[in-house]
Amino acid sequence: MIDFSLMIDYLRGRSSKGYELFGAHFVWENNQSQVCFAVYAPQAKVVSLIGDFNVWNPWPMQRLDCGVWVLTSPDPQPGDRYKYRITTAGGEIWDRADPFAFFTELRPNTASVIQRLDGYHWQDGAFLSTRQKNFNRPLNIYELHAGSWRMKDGDGSERFLQYDELADQLIPYIRQMGYTHIELLPLTEYPLDASWGYQVSGYFSATSRYGSPHQLMALIDRCHQAGIGVILDFVPTHFVPDYYALARFDGSCLYEPDNPNLRDSPWGTVLFDFTKPHVLSFLRSALDFWITVYHFDGIRYDAVSNLIYQGGSKDKGLNEPGLWFLRSTNFTLQQDHPEVMLIAEDSSDYLKVTAPVVYGGLGFDYKWNLGWMHDTLDYLATPFAERVGMKNRFLFSMSYFYQENYILPLSHDEVVHGKKTILDKLWGSYEQKFAQLRCLYCYMLFHPGKKLSFMGNELAEFMEWSEERQPGWNLLDYPVHRSFHTFLQRLNALYCTCPALWEQDFDSSYFQWLDMGSVFPEIFAIQRRDGSGQELVLLLNLSDRDCPNYPLSAHLPATPSAYRLLLDSQSKQEVDKEPLSSDSISLPGLSCLILQRENS
């Protein structure tokens, strides 16, 4: 039965539980199991249900006063395909997928599939009971595309690992590499593989490319049992223009703007209209759905700048409806799921993105620091002789860092579309690129902020990522790539075991530049501390010239003998961790050293 009070909340833009009202739900009526279908199509002239259970012959649905169409029948069964046949006010007939479908048949087919989500027995209670937003915990995220992380032999969809197969291989690898979380590129259903999931057709449907909803639940459950958090990439801004999905759903612009000048996105998709209350409820419900039903530990919102500014451009003015969506949705999610991370992929300089809504913020917990990423990679792509003039750009990120809670991303966006891979962006010879890659990750480790790196970065790829092939795992057969892979494991392990590198990320009193290139313009020193007094120091030489006598006594807070060497980026072996015995140290070109204060 339809709960009309919940329905009114949904239509007024106040609901985050629309998935409990709409779609196909099993109910017990007249002493038998039946399926209740409900769809919102207020401008439709007629809505009928078609599917396997009626040999695709239309069954007329009943229209309620609020514009919702309903039908209950004992005939539909789990696994049956179905659609809504909508006759518009103008007499056009369109067969539509269910906006609230929990599953969809494998592309290129587009029918919704009746799916029971109950019945999976979660075993992640211990993990959920200690789940936090990780402000004072290590947060080192491995971003991946589920369809291409590993691929099987074969053609088309046969190449994809199913969710359980992915779990078998991915979880041991993540534990081996020392990442704390994985972040999955969008898993909401989408028609085009080449969109990577960013052109969504089903906001409540886990893509059928990789298996069933219960298989996805099992992947997340197994990650949790292994101590690994799982973050979902989510697209709240736009959807596919295909007429089987949301576009002109009931013949009107139900989900998109009525004004055609405001309808199209830069990605060839259709923008949501956040002035329409039911759109707010639709997207808020989708976010709540993935957290509640699938136990995701964080949601990363894609393209937030387009919700802040019209067209994503500051020159076009604020997107007030988009801002209202962000504030109202994040406020609700923070209340309902206070331990789940809300992350903004935002390239704008809009302030208070990670401030609470009650203090005038947008209510996110973290924001990607794309400025740090661009400035750092641009510096390392600059010829050595020209880096002196780039010093201020390299240092710039710390001038604004404490305005937000930042994640430092080396994401999928930076290794596609001719941008080159992280390794290949770096200036210099083959050997110099690898030396700088080690320095980059050490610097990233020491820079305040949580960490994110895309799959393949750990292999030191030279080939850009493509969804059509897996990363170059065979690179690990080559000593230089295997050596970097091992180095990154050591670095990740160091990160997780040293609270100085994550405990006080967002408190400026626990970070200090010890050397901002004051004597040697391409040599820097950073100090990180934690609340117990542990102190780590990074010495970083980003020139191609050796510095045989770097003056430790001029830059370290204590005498050099109080420190021991923890890691050397040029050493393939564990370093001698005896206390330093000299007031100076050799710092080769394109290298870095990590020191630990003995009494810390």
Protein language model annotation of sequence segments:
Residues F37-Y40, V47, L542-T559:
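Surface-exposed beta-strand/loop patches in extracellular or lumenal glycoproteins
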Residues M1-C36, R63-E143, S148-E158, E165:
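The feature marks proteins involved in alpha-glucan
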Residues P471-A493, C498, Y550-E578:
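C-terminal accessory region downstream of the catalytic core in glycan-modifying enzymes
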Residues E105, F127-N136, H145-F296, R300-L318:
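Substrate-binding/active-site clefts of carbohydrate-active enzymes
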Residues V39, Y84, L144, I174, ...:
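Conserved, mostly hydrophobic/aromatic
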Residues P108, H295-D297, G312-E468, C496, ...:
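Conserved alpha/beta catalytic core and glycan-binding cleft of carbohydrate-active enzymes
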Residues P78-Y82, K577-S600:
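C-terminal beta-strand-rich structural cap/linker in extracellular carbohydrate-active enzymes
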